[in-house]
Structures are given as C-alpha cells and as structure tokens.
C-alpha cells in the first residue's frame, strides 16, 4: 500500500489520470490524498468529481475555496463565471448527487499514524492541532446540514481576520473557512491578511507567508497544503509541503508518494490551458 498526495487538480482530469497511471495507482490497495480545489479553471471538473467520488474510501480529500464556490453557485448564491468552466458540471444529470457528496467532504484531514495534517490553504499559526480539528468539524457540520445555503451566503468576506476562542456563529465559521481554504499571508501576530496574493518575496512588509511564522501544531506533524500555485512547491520549511504547482495555468500536476518521499509530475495539456499565462495569484 502506498499513500499518494496530489496538489490542486482544478478540473485537469486527463492530467490526473495520467499522473496516477505513472504509479499504477490501485484504489484497492493505495490511498489518494487531494489538497482540494478539485474543480474550476480546467476543462474536466465534471469528470474529476465523478472519478474521485467513484474511488470511495481510497480517497482522503479536503475542500478548497473553489469547491466551496461551486457549492455556492449551485445553490444560487454566487454567479457562474465562464472562466471557471463548470457549466457542464452544473448541467449534468447527476449534478445533485455530486454536489451533495461534495458538501459532505472534510476541510481538514489528520492522520495520527502517518503524522499528516492536510488543509487546502494550510493551518493558521494561531491554531494548535486540537483547535484546527474543532473549527474544521464546525464548518463540516454546517456544510453537511440542511442549512448549508445560509452558511454559503455568509462565508464570503475577509473579517474577522484574527482568531479568538470567543468568536461564535457565522463570524467564527467565516474565520475558520478563510484560514483553512483562503489563507496565504499573515501579520507577525498571526492575524490573517486576505488581500495580498503576491508571490513570496514581493509581498509588502510586515506580511509573511503563514508557514514562516512560529507554529502551534506539534512538530511531529507534516502539514500538507495546496492553494498557492505561485510557490511552485518551493520555499516551505521542514514539516510543511506545498503541492499546488499550477497545472491549470500551464504548470504541472504534482504528486508525492509519502512512504519514500518520491515526487511525480504530469505537465499540463497545452490545449486545455486557460486564456492568459500563469495567472496563478488569482487561484
């Protein structure tokens, strides 16, 4: 059995299948971890969801900000943007089944045996592992409930951007969602900055990538994340691994086999690229 971790797929179905073929992935024996943002931007969001769902317990995934946006579009809360290329998914005969499956997926994965923690954007330096798990469970509970459209309608927004155990209600859920699915930069005290999307090294002072601040998550855990394509999988400290390498922008789809720490990549299909080149900061 092998554990494979893959960065943001973003609807790049052909690349996903080709990448898994490189290692003869066997869902009967192997486990596949996905950093979220399965959908949008690439041409095959519908096929990606159908395939990942078909893998059943062989998959451990987390939701990303684009996955949440898809839920909001399907619920009539947000508008469908042509650049997301999700219309075939929205109009599919099995759309209801796929959406209801998707909204019941977690926003955080923790494996105590492998000592792996995975969230789409990472783990805010203001959280220890117990707080991250608690806040993730709260988001997951509302997403899987009948009142999930109310949450989706309220999740958009950048405030509050500073963690406090006293946060409650929709404000607490919004902070948790932003920390788990949208975070990139923080102020030195750990407060989230939800504005800057610049590549590392070009962000204005005093902002720092979240992973450069002291962490409260125990050092025994490795944090796996996606979301930040302009990192190109580089520049993170020991114990933090970024796997989004911008496949939908012309980069690669990247996979890590955990047991031997071997990386595999699959280049983007040039014919499937979005108009424009490397707009990674917008992802």
Curated annotation (Swiss-Prot):
The terms under GO molecular function for this entry are:
bis(5'-nucleosyl)-tetraphosphatase (symmetrical) activity
Q: Which reaction does it catalyse?
A: P(1),P(4)-bis(5'-adenosyl) tetraphosphate + H2O = 2 ADP + 2 H(+)
- Family membership noted in the UniProt record: Belongs to the Ap4A hydrolase family.
Q: Which domain of life is it from?
A: Bacteria
Biological classification of the source: Bacteria, Pseudomonadati, Pseudomonadota, Gammaproteobacteria, Enterobacterales
Under the heading NCBIfam families, the entry gives: apaH (TIGR00668), PRK00166.1 (NF001204)
Source organism of the structure: Serratia proteamaculans (strain 568)
Into which EC class is this enzyme placed?
hydrolase
Q: Which UniProt keywords apply?
A: Hydrolase
The name under which this protein is listed is Bis(5'-nucleosyl)-tetraphosphatase, symmetrical
- Record EC number: 3.6.1.41
């Amino acid at each position: 059995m092998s554990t494979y971790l893959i960065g943001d797929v973003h609807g790049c179905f052909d690349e996903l299948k080709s990448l898994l073929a490189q290692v003869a992935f066997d869902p009967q024996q192997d486990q596949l971890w996905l950093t979220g943002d399965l959908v949008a931007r690439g041409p095959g969001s519908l096929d990606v969801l159908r395939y990942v769902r078909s893998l059943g317990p062989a998959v451990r995934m987390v939701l990303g900000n684009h996955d949440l946006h898809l839920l909001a579009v399907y619920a009539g809360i947000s508008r469908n943007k042509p650049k997301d290329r999700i219309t075939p998914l929205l109009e599919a005969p099995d759309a209801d089944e796929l959406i209801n499956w998707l909204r019941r997926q977690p926003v955080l994965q923790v494996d105590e045996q492998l000592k792996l923690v995975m969230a789409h954007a990472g783990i805010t330096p203001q959280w220890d592992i117990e707080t991250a798990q608690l806040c993730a469970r709260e988001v997951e509970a509302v997403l899987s409930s009948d009142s999930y459209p109310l949450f989706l309608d309220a999740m958009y927004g950048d405030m509050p951007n500073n963690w406090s155990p006293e946060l409650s209600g929709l404000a607490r859920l919004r902070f948790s969602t932003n920390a788990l699915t949208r975070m990139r930069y923080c102020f030195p005290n750990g407060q989230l900055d939800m504005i800057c999307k610049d590549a590392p090294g070009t962000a204005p002072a005093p902002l720092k990538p979240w992973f450069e601040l002291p962490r409260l998550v125990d050092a025994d855990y490795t944090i796996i994340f996606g979301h930040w394509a302009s990192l190109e999988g580089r520049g993170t400290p020991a114990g933090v691994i970024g796997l989004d390498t911008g496949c939908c922008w012309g980069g690669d789809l990247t996979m890590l086999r955990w047991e031997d720490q071997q990386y595999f990549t699959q280049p983007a299909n040039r014919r499937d690229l979005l108009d424009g080149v490397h707009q990674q900061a917008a992802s």
